[in-house]
């Protein structure tokens, strides 16, 4: 059905197959940059992530908020089974994420989207997968040195793929050095990524090799414990970690301590510390920064939001020798709604999805 035949009063339902391939990583980075900028300009438009757990390990995460400039307000909700395997977290089962999109001016429910789950099934066009990678890209663009071209990467899974795609969208890559615990996995990953973006992607043997000489150091793992020694960091580097778990995993007895990819030394040496959402650090007791704050290594006032850097209310990097640290601590609706609105509009224009005409609409 073409867009001009659509019933604009109906709710549009989109399934996973109907939203594939509708946004590029370059567009995702631009959309999320707008989302975080608007989140800083209008802070009551987004709320911290909230999570609840069942006794059997099912976790439901909700991300409420909106982007006034795009005319959307809503939420992303997803459920998954969470399991701990040694020093790593895994997900034996994940359900499709559900996006609800309301018109931020009229309160009309415009659409319901069921997102993709696994990158191996959907390729690398999953808007859920794009979110974390593209947010890293926004941080690299804003905080890494302008001449950054050598990248060190921990991890060789789906998160790592989208990290490389994101940095390729914002910087001219000369080389990416990759370390993961399994040599065969990292070799295969590098071969695959090298052909995907036609850049030099090389496996390395130690964490030290990842950090030495890199302009940007990125961790993209499911680790529960620090993956590198912060004393190895070099002046001028930009550092990114992504594990920002919630304290309920400890309170519920699944973990003995909070998950974190960074160590205290990384936090101690960072001249600039940026997160996606400040309140989540304290509300969820996210160990990567919550623990150093409790120990007095830094104060909460040392932690700034990514949106502050984008709007200029915080200067971000002010010198080439500074170590900047982006704790990509959790998803936010600022990112989710920015991506979802673009995908939703394009799907509707392309005639995708199923219209649901509710007999009893909302009232004025």
Regions flagged by a language model, labelled:
Residues 128-152, 158-169:
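Short internal alpha-helix immediately C-terminal to a glycine-rich phosphate-binding loop
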Residues 224-238:
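Rossmann-fold NAD(P) dinucleotide-binding segment
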Residues 212-213, 234-235, 269:
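Alpha-helix C-terminal capping/helix-to-coil transition sites in glycosyltransferase folds
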Residues 169-196:
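NAD(P)-binding Rossmann-fold cofactor-contacting core
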Residues 1-129, 147, 304, 334-337, ...:
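N-terminal ligand-binding/catalytic initiation module
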Residues 197-214, 231:
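Short acidic low-complexity segments
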Residues 238, 242-315:
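Rossmann-fold NAD(P)-binding glycine/threonine-rich loop
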């Amino acid at each position: 059905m073409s867009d001009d035949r659509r019933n604009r009063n109906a709710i549009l339902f989109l399934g996973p197959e109907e939203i594939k391939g509708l946004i590029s990583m370059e567009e995702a980075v631009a959309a999320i940059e707008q989302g975080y900028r608007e989140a800083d300009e209008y802070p009551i438009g987004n709320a911290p992530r909230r999570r609840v757990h069942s006794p059997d390990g099912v976790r439901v995460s909700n991300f409420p908020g909106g982007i006034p400039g795009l005319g959307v307000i809503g939420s992303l909700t997803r459920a998954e089974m969470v399991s701990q395997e040694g020093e790593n977290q895994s997900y034996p089962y994940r359900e499709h994420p559900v996006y609800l999109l309301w018109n931020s001016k009229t309160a009309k429910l415009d659409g319901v989207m069921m997102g993709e789950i696994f990158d191996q099934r959907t390729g690398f066009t999953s808007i859920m997968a794009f979110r974390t990678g593209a947010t890293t890209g926004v941080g690299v663009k804003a905080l890494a040195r302008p001449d950054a071209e050598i990248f060190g990467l921990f991890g060789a899974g789906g998160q790592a793929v989208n990290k490389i795609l994101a940095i390729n969208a914002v910087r001219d890559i000369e080389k990416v050095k990759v370390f993961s615990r399994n040599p065969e996995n990292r070799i295969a990953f590098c071969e695959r990524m090298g052909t995907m973006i036609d850049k030099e992607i090389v496996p390395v043997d130690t964490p030290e090799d990842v950090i030495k000489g890199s302009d940007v150091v990125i961790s993209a793992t499911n680790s529960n414990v620090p993956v590198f020694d912060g004393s190895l960091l070099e002046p001028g580097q930009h550092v990114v970690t992504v594990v920002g778990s919630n304290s309920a995993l400890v309170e519920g007895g699944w973990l003995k301590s909070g998950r974190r990819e960074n160590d205290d030394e990384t936090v101690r040496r960072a001249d600039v510390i940026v997160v996606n959402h400040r309140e989540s650090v304290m509300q969820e007791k996210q160990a990567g920064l919550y623990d150093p704050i409790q120990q007095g290594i830094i104060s909460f006032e040392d932690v700034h939001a990514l949106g502050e850097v984008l709007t200029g209310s915080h200067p971000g990097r002010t010198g080439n020798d500074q170590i900047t640290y982006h704790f990509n601590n959790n998803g936010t609706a600022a990112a989710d709604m920015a991506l979802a609105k673009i995908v939703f509009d394009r799907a509707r224009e392309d005639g995708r999805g199923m219209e649901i005409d509710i007999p009893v609409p909302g009232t004025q």
